[in-house]
């Protein structure tokens, strides 16, 4: 027996039903907010992720790369390890004439995991807002993400906020090298005692500020204002990112959005430049995003600010209850026929499909529990329509009567 690749998953019919359900809710939400759908290729040049320094060396170690042979001059390509960077490249290639671009997409990303315990292929639903730099733009993306999750039936979504520039401003006072800053931040998150002791001795005011940010979880702009007041002389470099952070949470306060300020949630801040947000449902990390104002110019494009987010389909799929998809099951129609009525069965099935309803021919072994209705063609003028959910049956003479009934019309 041939096994699937380690770290990869098959999506079975029930998984795909949930996949499409989540995707449709996300897509519908995006369209109503003015976002337009795009799709980027699975393969991108490795240079897209290396030349601009958009991904850390640690992340680049996890990409799948290989030579795209063209004689001996082939370039190295990768299976995309990220959704935002290709979307930014797409904007530079094809959409620069748009001053403001709202883009959304579904994409799979690939990241190597040596253990094989984590998934190496993950599906994401992404949205990017390009050309606007304001707290209101950040709030729009956060609200869109929360709205999508609410429509999926998740009531208690935890929103955690951090700020990339604030993290960088703190770390810059400890280590000027950007790559080393990522390591130090990981050490801080892991509670490295030696590092904390060194910091307390060498930079006591910065230590107090950092300790306050790392150990406390604020829920309002006043928390950040208190941090600024307590930072003292160490707060000079922190003032600008703190003010930007305060402006962002002020907008969320006005909109009545609940959140938690958690600097530690900013892990993985590679190309972010401002507010970073993460979304949790029952403790499960289901999405996140932030502001990346320098990414597009880093890739050779215009000086355009941007922000975006992704929802993690692989994590959402097992969290969707079948009852949440009741309407999708209810709309599936099973078509049966007796005797020599195959052609009539095809006719009624096509009429049902023209109404935008799924109609499938019955074969032995089909599980009727997956369908809302069954239509049995007994003759050209005799149709038995069964509500499989309510277990009620009605006999009709005309195809039009069947269509009226399945469409919820009272004329039948």
Curated annotation (Swiss-Prot):
Pathway: Amino-acid biosynthesis; L-histidine biosynthesis; L-histidine from 5-phospho-alpha-D-ribose 1-diphosphate: step 1/9. GO terms for molecular function: histidine-tRNA ligase activity. Keywords: Amino-acid biosynthesis, Cytoplasm, Histidine biosynthesis. PROSITE patterns: AA_TRNA_LIGASE_II. Pfam families: tRNA-synt_His. Required for the first step of histidine biosynthesis. May allow the feedback regulation of ATP phosphoribosyltransferase activity by histidine. Belongs to the class-II aminoacyl-tRNA synthetase family. HisZ subfamily. Heteromultimer composed of HisG and HisZ subunits. This is ATP phosphoribosyltransferase regulatory subunit. It comes from Dehalococcoides mccartyi (strain ATCC BAA-2100 / JCM 16839 / KCTC 5957 / BAV1). The gene is hisZ.
């Amino acid at each position: 027996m041939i096994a699937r690749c380690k770290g990869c998953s098959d999506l079975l019919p029930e998984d795909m039903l949930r996949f499409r359900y989540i995707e449709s809710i996300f897509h519908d939400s995006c369209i109503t907010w003015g976002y337009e759908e795009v799709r980027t290729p699975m393969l991108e040049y490795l240079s897209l992720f290396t030349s601009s320094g958009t991904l850390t060396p640690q992340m680049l170690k996890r990409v799948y790369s290989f030579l795209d042979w063209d004689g001996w001059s082939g370039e190295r390509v990768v299976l995309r390890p990220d959704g935002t960077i290709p979307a930014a490249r797409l904007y530079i290639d094809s959409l620069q004439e748009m001053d403001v671009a709202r883009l959304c997409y579904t994409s799979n990303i690939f990241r190597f995991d040596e253990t094989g315990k984590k998934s190496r292929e993950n599906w994401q639903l992404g949205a990017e807002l390009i050309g606007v730099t304001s707290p209101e733009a950040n709030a729009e993306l956060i609200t869109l993400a929360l709205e999508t999750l609410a429509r999926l039936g998740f009531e208690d979504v935890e929103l955690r906020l951090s700020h990339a520039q604030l993290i960088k401003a703190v770390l810059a006072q400890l280590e000027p090298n950007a790559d080393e800053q990522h390591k130090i931040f990981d050490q801080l998150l892991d509670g490295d005692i030696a590092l904390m002791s060194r910091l307390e001795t060498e930079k006591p005011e910065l230590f107090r500020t950092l300790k306050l940010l790392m150990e406390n979880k604020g829920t309002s702009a006043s928390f950040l204002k208190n941090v600024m007041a307590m930072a003292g002389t160490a707060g000079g470099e922190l003032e600008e990112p703190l003010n930007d952070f305060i402006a962002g949470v002020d907008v969320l306060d006005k909109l009545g959005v609940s959140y938690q300020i958690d600097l530690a949630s900013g892990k993985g801040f590679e190309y972010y430049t401002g507010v970073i947000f993460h979304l949790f449902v029952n403790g499960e990390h289901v999405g996140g995003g932030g502001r990346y104002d320098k990414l597009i110019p880093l890739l050779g494009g215009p000086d355009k600010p941007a922000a975006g987010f992704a929802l993690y389909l692989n994590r959402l799929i097992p969290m969707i209850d079948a009852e949440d998809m009741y309407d999708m099951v209810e709309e599936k129609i099973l078509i049966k026929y007796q005797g020599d009525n195959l052609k009539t069965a095809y006719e009624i099935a096509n009429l049902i499909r023209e109404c935008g309803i799924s109609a499938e021919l019955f074969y032995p072994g089909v599980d009727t529990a997956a369908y809302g209705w069954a239509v049995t063609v007994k003759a050209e003028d005799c149709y038995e329509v069964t509500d499989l959910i309510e277990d009620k049956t009605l006999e009709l003479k005309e195809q039009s009567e069947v269509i009226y009934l399945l469409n919820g019309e009272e004329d039948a």
